[in-house]
Amino acid sequence: MDVSPPQQLPLEAQQRVCEPTCVLLEVADQPQEQRLGLMQRPALPPLRGMWFPFKPARPLRFWMLNTIAPLDMVFVHQGEVIAIEAEVPICLALPCQSFGPMADADGVIELGTGEAKRLGLGVGDAVVIEPITLKSPKQKVDEIRRSVTGDTLW
């Protein structure tokens, strides 16, 4: 059993589901980050997830070893959902089942269990992953004011 502490990666990207809904994503783009994934992490809140990009595309299989909360896995190839593994159960000891399509994928989004369905994600849907632009505190305050007041003259 892996006793690595859980990793918490910075929110670096977002997935546009349908305007204006975005899922904030931690990006696991290094082999060690991908190996640890969401191990030992509590359940993800709504609109949060982890993005695992892979180059080149290839058949990807994920398992849930030491993942303590069930997840949805959204497999992506060239900006399109190619498979969804919903409500994947936890696995605390080997052997663990692996999940994924037999087709090439260039990324996987892990979401809290039931989140893919709640968001209405389906096979064939477009997936847009974009970096989060860092904003100054003033820009954040102005954005909140605009969202509350509807005023575009800030």
Regions found by a protein language model. Give the residues of each.
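Compact, glycine-rich, soluble single-domain proteins
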Residues: 1-154
